[in-house]
Amino acid sequence: MSFIVEKINCNSLPLKRKTRFAAGHDVYTPYDVVFEVGQTEAKVYTNLVVKSVPEGCAIIVAGRSGLMHGNGMRAIDDEITVGSEDELIITLTRKTGLDKRVVLKSETRVAQIIADTTQDVKLVELPISTYGLDVNHGDVPVYKFNTHWRLEAMPWLRDYQGNRNEVYLRLKSEHFNGIIDPDYKGDIIYMSETPFERLDELYVEVRQFSGETYLGGESPDNVVRGEGGFGSTGGH
């Protein structure tokens, strides 16, 4: 999965492993990053980086040892360019002990940022109806893919065919588990830069314009539902 970096420091690109950024840089993550009391390190694994780095923290760019390419194991290059197919990990290191909980709030415009920085990919629609599955509300269908495709967050995706949901994708291990909300009427649009070269898990996050959020990777009790939404509970 490409780790797209924006608004860190243009002069620092291409990023090198172990590159450090001081506290205060304006960077993004598609989900909240939490420092618990006493915690000195936090990692961010997905498309963008970290917003509002706390005073006294440093950001370290590192490579991931197990990438979803071929057999799943590949060392990353010494230099990482924006748009490369390497997933980077941003490590937030707290230089001193914490005396309070710190939450780095996520950036919600991930789709638009990806659209601005991604090239040579295409949009793929995956409506539920194409799977041929007999799925009832509350069931946990397993969607598996073994095809090679990429897709991009197109600039017009936010209004695509009247669908008011924004869907983000993260790549995990071997399958995607989802619970279908019976009120959902639109297509589920998966967005990724990663070629699916083997059975991989789709980890989906859906945000509605009205503000409701559906998060993959949470238990059904933690899924927030809203009218016309799709709740997913991706397995780990």
Curated annotation (Swiss-Prot):
- Check the record and name the Pfam families matching this protein: dUTPase
UniProt cross-references to InterPro entries, sorted A to Z: dUTPase-like (IPR029054), dUTPase-like_sf (IPR036157)
Q: Which residue ranges does the record annotate as region Disordered?
A: 217-236
Domain of life of the native organism: Viruses
- Biased composition, Gly residues: where in the chain? 226-236
Coiled coil residues, start to end: none
Q: What is this protein called?
A: Uncharacterized protein ORF75
**Which organism does this sequence originate in?**
Ostreid herpesvirus 1 (isolate France) (OsHV-1)
